[in-house]
Each structure stands twice: as C-alpha cells, then as structure tokens.
C-alpha cells in the first residue's frame, strides 16, 4: 500500500509542477498563500519528516525572513505525522485546492481528473494495513521494496528513449530536472547493495516453506495484479507527462524569459509571492503587440520625422529669401536719382543730334534725352521691380552721356 501511495504522490508532485508552469502567463490563477503554505508543510513532512532537529526557526524581520518563518511554521504544524500519512493528506488537499482554483482550463481539469481517479483507487484502503505489513517485514524486504520503487521512478524519468526520444543532455534544464528528483541512480544502487547485504544475513525462506503460512492467497494475488495494473497506468501517465515536459522545455530553451519553467520549478518557487509577475506580463504584452499596432507606430514616427525635416528646410529657405530681398531693396532704391526726364546743360545741338535722338527744348534752351520705353508710366508701374531696374539703367545712361559731353567740351 505504501508503494501505491508513493506512486500517487509522485503523480501529485508532477501535477503541481505542471500547474506552476502554467501560472502567471496562461491565465491560470494561483491559489491563496494559505493553501500553498499548507501544501509546502505537507510536502516537507512527507519527504523529510519532522522539522525538529533538521532546521531551526528562521530569525529576522525582512520579507524573506517572514516568508521563511511562515513556511517553517507550516512544516512544524505537521509534527508527528508519518510520511505516508503526510503524503495522503498532501494528495487529498491538493485535489481539493485544484477543484477550487485550478478548474478553469481544459488541461487543469484533465490533470485533476487523472489525479482524482488514481487517488480514488487507494483512498479507501486504511493506512494501518500497509504500516502493519511493513512493520512485520524485515529490513532487507523494506530496503528491497524501496529500491525497486526508486529504480522504477528513475527508469521512467531517465530513460532517454522512452521519455523523449533524444539524449537528455541536449537540454540542461531537463538534466537538472532528472537530477533533482527524489533520488538518483547511485543512491538506488547503494540501497540495492544494502538489501543484498541484509538478505545474506537473514535469508528469506523459499516459497515452498511459506506456502502454508497463509501469506499468498487468491485475494492477495488479485490485489497484487490490481496494484501492478495501477503501477503500469501510472508509468504510462508519467511517460506521457515527460514527453510533454520535454516539448515545452525544447520550445522555451532559446527564450531567456521563460527559461525557468516546467520541472525547474521547486516548491519554494510555488510558495513565493508573485511580486514580479505584473512586470513580466507588461513586458510580454509589449512583446506580443499586434502587427497592425507596430505598423501604425512606425508610420507615425516616419511622418513626424518627415514633418520635422520639411519645417527645417522651409525655415532655411525663408531666411535665404529674406536676405536676398533685403539686398535687392538696398541696391535698387536710390532716392532722387530716378526720373523720366533729365535736364542737361546746354550743349552743341549738332553733336547730340548725331549721337542720339535729341529734341530741342524752347524753354531756356534745355535738352532732353528721350527714351520711349522708359518714359511711359502707363506701360510699367513705378513701384514694380522691373520699372525700378529700368529707371536705374536710364540714370546710368544719362550719367555716361554727361561724362562724354564734359570730356568733349
């Protein structure tokens, strides 16, 4: 019976690790801290026994010390409970907790139904029967049974062909998971050697001498067959769970954010508060933004850069245009120098008439240089840029004519 309890207990440990790997990012809520601490105390009592003599109560006022005290008190509350009874309570309490807090997803319901089915097969059997049979058995028989149980556990976990179809050394986290199980292969070999030693000291009588002692009956044979069927079913379930765990570990091996998942999670991780889960969820939400949002953000950023560049070039062009306008105005506006008629000094009428079209002015003998394309105010506006340029050109021609006349005179 103890062997069956151990098998279901191993299944419960695998179930809680699977649930822990789904908590925080798959929508599966964590149970309250009281439930987790209770499970922690039962787990420590089932695997290590009483806390007295193992460790002292932690001291300190820090949050870590308070959490350690809470876990130590939960372990201490199970003082005096046998390991087998602690395993039974652990399985039963885990099933009740899963019914309340881990029944929202299909995977969680499947895990719960599998664990509950296995538990119903052995929950009605009294633990006293198993304890009595163990107390009557010799040390060699106890060690042999325990070694067989552990060897069977190791064969399910460590067989690279039946568990994953590949070398488990390929994934470091898978290797840590195998080494962090309850016992390793070397310990099982030592237990086998101890059982052989006790068998040599107290050899077991042959089956013929025990045939009439009432130890083997049809009822016991049926029970053993039923127990073997249960063990085979559990082995198959563990094999399937290991395959699923290997797939998850292989898919998350290249992702540093989720490198600590699945079988890497311990009971301490399960008990600790999820203080950093909210920041992790925000980070994952940013990572998992839809493609449309990313494209929209990229387009907006490009538009902002384009607008900034256009404004910069427009400002530079405006400054250049302002400087050019100022230079043109300063070079064009010449007050009191532009006029349509220029009075000249009295010169010789014949020379001027030969060089240019000069008409005599009867008013005081003054002469006027006539440029028809400049004289017409109706043709060009005085304030226009072209009109001002033509006036400047007219003044220049008048100035050159004066110089030539002065030299000739």
Swiss-Prot record:
Topological domain ranges for the Cytoplasmic compartment: 1-313
Annotated Pfam families: ACBP
Domain ACB: 5-103
Induction behaviour: Repressed in glucose and ethanol media, but induced under peroxisome proliferation conditions in methanol and oleate media.
Major localization listed first in the record, in broad terms: membrane
PTM remark: Phosphorylated.
GO BP terms, alphabetized: fatty acid metabolic process; pexophagy; protein transport
Segments on the Peroxisomal face: 335-409
Bilayer topology term: Single-pass membrane protein
Protein location: Peroxisome membrane
Cellular component GO terms, alphabetical: membrane; peroxisomal membrane; peroxisome
Membrane-spanning segments: 314-334
Family the UniProt entry places it in: Belongs to the ATG37 family.
Name of the protein in question: Autophagy-related protein 37
């Amino acid at each position: 019976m103890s062997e069956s309890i151990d098998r279901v207990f191993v299944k419960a440990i695998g179930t809680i690790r699977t649930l822990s790997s789904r908590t925080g990012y798959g929508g599966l809520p964590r149970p309250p801290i009281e439930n987790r601490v209770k499970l922690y105390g039962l787990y420590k009592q089932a695997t290590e026994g009483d806390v007295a003599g193992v460790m002292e109560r932690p001291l300190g006022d820090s949050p870590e010390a308070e959490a350690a005290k809470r876990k130590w008190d939960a372990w201490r509350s199970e003082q005096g409970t046998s390991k087998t009874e602690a395993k039974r309570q652990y399985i039963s309490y885990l099933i009740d907790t899963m019914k309340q807090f881990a029944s929202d997803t299909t995977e969680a319901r499947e895990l719960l139904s599998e664990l509950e089915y296995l538990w119903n097969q052995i929950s009605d059997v009294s633990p006293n029967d198993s304890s009595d049979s163990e107390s009557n058995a010799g040390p060699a028989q106890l060690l042999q049974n325990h070694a067989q149980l552990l060897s069977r556990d190791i064969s399910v976990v460590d067989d690279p062909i039946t568990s994953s179809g590949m070398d488990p050394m390929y994934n470091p986290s898978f290797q840590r998971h195998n080494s962090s199980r309850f016992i390793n292969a070397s310990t099982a070999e030592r237990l086998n050697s101890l059982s052989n030693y006790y068998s040599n000291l107290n050899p077991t009588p042959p089956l013929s001498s025990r045939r009439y002692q009432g130890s083997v009956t049809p009822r016991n044979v049926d029970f053993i067959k039923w127990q073997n069927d249960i063990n085979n079913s559990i082995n198959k379930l563990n094999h399937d769970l290991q395959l699923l765990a290997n797939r998850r570990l292989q898919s998350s091996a290249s992702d540093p954010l989720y490198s600590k998942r699945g079988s890497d999670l311990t009971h301490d991780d399960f008990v600790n508060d999820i203080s950093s889960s909210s920041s992790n969820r925000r980070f994952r939400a940013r990572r998992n933004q839809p493609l449309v949002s990313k494209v929209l953000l990229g387009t907006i950023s490009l538009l902002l850069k384009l607008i900034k560049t256009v404004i910069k070039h427009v400002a530079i062009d405006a400054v250049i245009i302002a400087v050019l306008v100022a230079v043109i105005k300063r070079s064009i506006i010449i007050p009191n120098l532009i006029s349509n008629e220029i009075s000249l000094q009295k010169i010789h009428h014949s020379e001027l008439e030969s060089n240019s079209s000069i008409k005599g002015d009867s008013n005081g003998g003054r002469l006027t240089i006539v440029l028809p394309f400049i004289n017409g105010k109706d043709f060009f506006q005085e304030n226009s840029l072209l009109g001002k340029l033509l006036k400047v050109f007219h003044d220049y021609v008048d100035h050159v004519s004066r110089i030539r006349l002065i030299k000739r005179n």
